[in-house]
C-alpha cells in the first residue's frame, strides 16, 4: 500500500501542470460543452458575440487610423503583426524544461527572424529608399553601397546563426534542437512569404492592400453573423462551427461588397496612387484608366425595372469582383488549414491577445492567402506589360554608380545628337 501511495504521489502535480498547459485543448471538444456545437445552439453565444463585436470594433477603428496615416505606417503595422505571429508560432512547440537546459537558444530563433526580415524588406524597399535619399549625395552613396552588398550581409548573418546553432548542440537534446531549427525556418517561410506580397501591394497603391484585406474581414464577419443566426448545416469537420449558411451568406455579401467598395475606394488618390519613396507626404498622380469612370447603358430588361437607364462604374470594379470571389470561396480554406493545424496540436487558438478572436495568427490565416493572390492578380492582369521610363530610371539608379550614370548620360547624349544630325 505504501509503495502504491509513494508511486502515485508524483503523478498529481504532473497532471495539474499538463492541465494548465492544455486548458485550451479542443481535440474532441472535451471539457468544452459547446466544442462541437453550432453557434445557433450555443447557450453562451450572445456573450461570445458581444466580446467578439467589441474587439472587432476597436480593430477596425485602429486599422482605419493607420490607413489614413499612409504607406509607411501600414508597413510598420505589418512588421508588428509579423513579430506577434512569429512569437505565437515559436511558442507553439517550445518546451520549458528543454529551453532551461539551452540558455540563449530562444535568442537564436529571433536572430534568424530578423535576418529574414532584413533580407525581405531590403529587397522590397531598396528602390524606394534610394529614391528617398537621392538628393543627399552622402546618404545616396551610403545607401547604394549597402544595397549592393545587401545579399552578402544577409548571408553572413544567416551563416553566423547557422554556426551558432551548431555550437549550441547538446547531447540528448539533438532531436529537440533540430526540430526547433526546422520549425523556425517553416515559420519564416510562412510569415515572410505573405508579408512580402502584402508590402508590395501597399506600395503599388493602398487600394491593392486595403480592398483585399477588407474583403477578408467582411467575409469573416458575415460568415459569423449568418452562421450565428441561420447556421444549421455543418460545412467542414475541421471547423465544426462553420456552416453552409454562413459560408453562402458571407460569399454573397463579400462579392457585393467588393463591387461597391472598389467604387468608393477608387475615388481617393491617397488610396490609388503608388508610393515611389518612403516619405509620408500627400500624393498626387494620374491613377490611370482603371480609376476613371465609364458610363454603361443598362439592358432593356433591367432598365425597365429600375429608375435609371445607365450606370457609371470604375473599370477596377470588374477586377474587384475577381478579388471578391477569391476572398469568399478560396481564402476561407486558409482558415480551414489553420483549424486542422490547431487540432493536430490540440490547441483552440494560437494565442489570446485578441478577446473573442484568439491570437494574431488566428486573424491572419485567410489574410495570408489573400495577400499572395492579390499581388499575383495585380501583376498578371492589371499592370500593363510595358517598359516605362520610370522603370528604366529605377534600374539605372539602383544598379549603376554615380560615375556610371554620368557616363551613360554622356553616351546617350552622343547617340541622340548623332540621330538628330543623321535625320
Swiss-Prot record:
Requires a divalent cation for activity. GO terms for biological process: CDP-diacylglycerol biosynthetic process. Its EC number is 2.7.7.41. Its main location: membrane. It is an enzyme of class 2 (transferase). It comes from the Eukaryota. Pathway: Phospholipid metabolism; CDP-diacylglycerol biosynthesis; CDP-diacylglycerol from sn-glycerol 3-phosphate: step 3/3. Residues 1-32 are annotated as: Disordered. It is found in: Membrane. The modification N-acetylmethionine is found at residue 1. The keyword Lipid biosynthesis applies. Keywords: Acetylation, Lipid biosynthesis, Lipid metabolism, Magnesium, Membrane, Nucleotidyltransferase, Phospholipid biosynthesis, Phospholipid metabolism, Transferase, Transmembrane, Transmembrane helix. The chain crosses the membrane at residues 60-80, 102-122, 149-169, 183-203, 205-225, 246-266, 321-341, 369-389. It catalyses: a 1,2-diacyl-sn-glycero-3-phosphate + CTP + H(+) = a CDP-1,2-diacyl-sn-glycerol + diphosphate. One of its GO terms (cellular component) is membrane. GO terms for molecular function: phosphatidate cytidylyltransferase activity. Its cofactor is Mg(2+). It is a multi-pass membrane protein. Belongs to the CDS family. May be involved in the synthesis of minor phospholipids and in modulation of IP3-mediated signal transduction. This is Phosphatidate cytidylyltransferase 2. The gene is CDS2.
Amino acid at each position: 500500500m505504501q509503495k502504491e501511495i509513494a508511486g502515485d504521489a508524483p503523478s498529481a502535480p504532473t497532471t495539474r501542470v499538463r492541465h494548465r498547459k492544455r486548458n485550451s485543448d479542443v481535440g474532441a471538444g472535451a471539457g468544452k460543452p459547446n466544442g462541437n456545437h453550432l453557434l445557433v445552439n450555443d447557450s453562451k453565444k450572445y456573450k461570445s458575440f458581444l466580446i467578439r463585436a467589441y474587439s472587432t470594433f476597436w480593430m477596425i477603428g485602429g486599422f482605419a487610423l493607420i490607413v489614413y496615416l499612409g504607406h509607411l505606417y501600414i508597413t510598420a503595422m505589418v512588421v508588428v503583426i509579423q513579430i506577434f505571429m512569429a512569437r505565437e508560432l515559436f511558442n507553439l512547440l517550445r518546451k520549458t524544461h528543454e529551453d532551461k537546459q539551452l540558455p540563449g537558444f530562444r535568442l537564436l530563433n529571433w536572430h534568424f527572424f530578423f535576418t529574414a526580415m532584413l533580407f525581405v524588406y531590403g529587397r522590397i524597399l531598396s528602390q524606394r529608399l534610394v529614391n528617398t535619399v537621392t538628393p543627399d549625395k552622402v546618404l545616396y552613396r551610403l545607401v547604394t553601397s549597402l544595397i549592393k552588398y545587401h545579399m552578402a550581409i544577409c548571408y553572413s548573418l544567416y551563416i553566423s546563426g547557422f554556426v551558432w546553432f551548431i555550437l549550441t548542440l547538446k547531447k540528448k537534446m539533438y532531436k529537440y534542437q533540430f526540430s526547433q531549427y526546422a520549425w523556425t525556418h517553416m515559420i519564416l517561410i510562412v510569415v515572410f512569404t505573405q508579408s512580402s506580397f502584402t508590402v508590395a501591394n501597399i506600395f503599388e497603391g493602398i487600394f491593392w492592400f486595403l480592398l483585399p484585406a477588407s474583403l477578408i474581414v467582411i467575409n469573416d464577419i458575415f460568415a459569423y453573423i449568418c452562421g450565428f443566426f441561420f447556421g444549421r448545416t455543418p460545412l467542414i469537420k475541421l471547423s465544426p462551427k462553420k456552416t453552409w449558411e454562413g459560408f453562402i451568406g458571407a460569399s454573397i455579401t463579400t462579392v457585393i461588397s467588393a463591387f461597391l467598395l472598389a467604387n468608393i475606394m477608387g475615388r481617393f488618390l491617397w488610396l490609388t496612387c503608388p508610393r515611389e519613396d518612403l516619405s509620408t507626404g500627400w500624393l498626387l498622380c494620374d491613377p490611370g484608366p482603371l480609376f476613371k469612370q465609364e458610363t454603361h447603358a443598362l439592358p432593356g430588361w433591367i432598365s425597365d425595372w429600375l429608375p435609371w437607364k445607365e450606370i457609371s462604374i470604375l473599370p477596377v470594379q470588374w477586377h474587384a469582383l475577381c478579388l471578391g470571389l477569391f476572398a469568399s470561396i478560396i481564402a476561407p480554406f486558409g482558415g480551414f488549414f489553420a483549424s486542422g493545424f490547431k487540432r493536430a496540436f490540440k490547441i483552440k487558438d494560437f494565442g489570446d491577445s485578441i478577446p473573442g478572436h484568439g491570437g494574431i495568427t488566428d486573424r491572419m490565416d485567410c489574410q495570408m492567402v489573400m495577400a499572395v493572390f492579390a499581388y499575383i492578380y495585380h501583376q498578371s492582369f492589371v499592370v500593363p506589360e510595358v517598359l516605362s521610363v520610370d522603370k528604366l530610371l529605377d534600374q539605372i539608379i539602383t544598379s549603376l554608380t554615380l560615375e556610371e550614370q554620368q557616363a551613360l548620360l554622356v553616351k546617350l547624349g552622343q547617340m541622340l545628337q548623332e540621330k538628330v544630325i543623321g535625320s
